[in-house]
């Protein structure tokens, strides 16, 4: 059985993937985080995002179709061998207080 389809990229991520190289070329000393930050600034300033929003909508429709096909073929129904997010116990959950935990006597001195 095929793997579950990956979620589609947002309009911003589609745009950033296409603009990343030009941002790097203009700012060769930028780190990955700085490229993303600059990309965010440029995206906010972008007047016409319709091209990227249309591409994102198409990608979302393709994802929905692929996901339905995946589920029709029996994917996603059973979680055998897969851990769910949030299934791990929270840090400190189930721990008992150390106060008096190692004490063998009940306070009686005989």
UniProtKB/Swiss-Prot annotation:
Q: What's the superkingdom here? A: Eukaryota
**Pfam families per UniProt:** HMG_box
PANTHER family registered for this protein in UniProt: HIGH MOBILITY GROUP PROTEIN D-RELATED, HIGH MOBILITY GROUP PROTEIN DSP1
Q: What is this protein called?
A: Mobility group protein 1B
Q: Which organism is it from?
A: Chironomus tentans (Midge)
In which family does this protein belong, per the annotation?
Belongs to the HMGB family.
Q: Which gene encodes it?
A: HMG1B
Sequence ranges of Basic and acidic residues compositional bias? 71-81
Record bears the keyword Transcription regulation = no
């Amino acid at each position: 059985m095929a793997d579950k389809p990956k979620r589609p990229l947002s309009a911003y991520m589609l745009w950033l993937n296409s603009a990343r190289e030009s941002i790097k070329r203009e700012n060769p000393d930028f780190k990955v985080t700085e490229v993303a930050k600059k990309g965010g600034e440029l995206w906010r300033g972008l007047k016409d995002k319709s091209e990227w929003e249309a591409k994102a909508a198409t990608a979302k429709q393709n994802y929905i179709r692929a996901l339905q096909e995946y589920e029709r073929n029996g994917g996603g129904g059973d979680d055998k061998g897969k851990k769910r997010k949030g299934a791990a116990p929270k840090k400190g959950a189930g721990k008992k207080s150390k106060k008096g935990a190692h004490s063998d006597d009940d306070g009686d001195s005989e």
